[in-house]
C-alpha cells in the first residue's frame, strides 16, 4: 500500500521474489535495496519511452533498422550515427534535409527521431501544413502562447515537407514565430524539396524569408539527399516481381495443361 502511495509499484511487485534471490545468494540489505530500486528505475524508463513514442507521431516503419544505408549519400551516411546520439539536441542545433521527392529525407529524419526517443528525448513528427494549421487555430482562439509553450516541451520537432506549404500572411507569421521561439534553444529537423533560394515561395516576404533562413542555419547540420528516387526504385522492383510471378504462373499453367493432355491421350490409347 505504501509503495503504491509512493508510486513505486515495481518494487512492490518484485520485493518478495528479489528477497528470496537475495537470501539464496547471500546479498547484503544494501544490495537487495539497490536491485529493487534499479528495477523501478528501469521500468519507469521503459514506460516513459513508450509514452514518448506514442506522442511523437513518428511513422513506425521509418526506423534506423529499415533504412537502406547503402543508398545514402556518403556525407549523410557518415553523419547519421552522430546525429542519432542526440548531441545536436543538447546544443539546440537544427538538422535540415534537402533533396528531390523520393530521396529518403523523411525516412532519415524519422530514423533520427526514433533514436532520440529511445534515448529518452521527447520528439514530435508533423507535416508542416498540419503544424501551421494547429498554430493558426490557436492564434484565432487567442491561445498561441500556450500552444507554443506546449510545443516547447519537445526536445526536437520534425517538420516534414516544408516546401509544400503555400501560406497566407497569417500562416507565414505563425510558422516564423514557431521557428523564432525555438532559435538556439530547441532543435528543429526540417525536410524540404526546395533549396533556400526558393524559400520565398514559403514565406513570401523577402525579409521574413532571410530572417527564417538565418535562424535555421546559424546552428545547423545540412544534409543533401542526392541520388535516385527510392520510391521509383521500389515501384520498379514491385513491377519486376509482379512480372516474375506472372511468368512463373503462366509456365506452371502450361506445364499442367501439357501433362493433362498427355494423360488424356494415354488413356484414350489404352481404350
Give the residues covered by each predicted segment.
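Conserved P-loop
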Residues: 75-153, 200-202
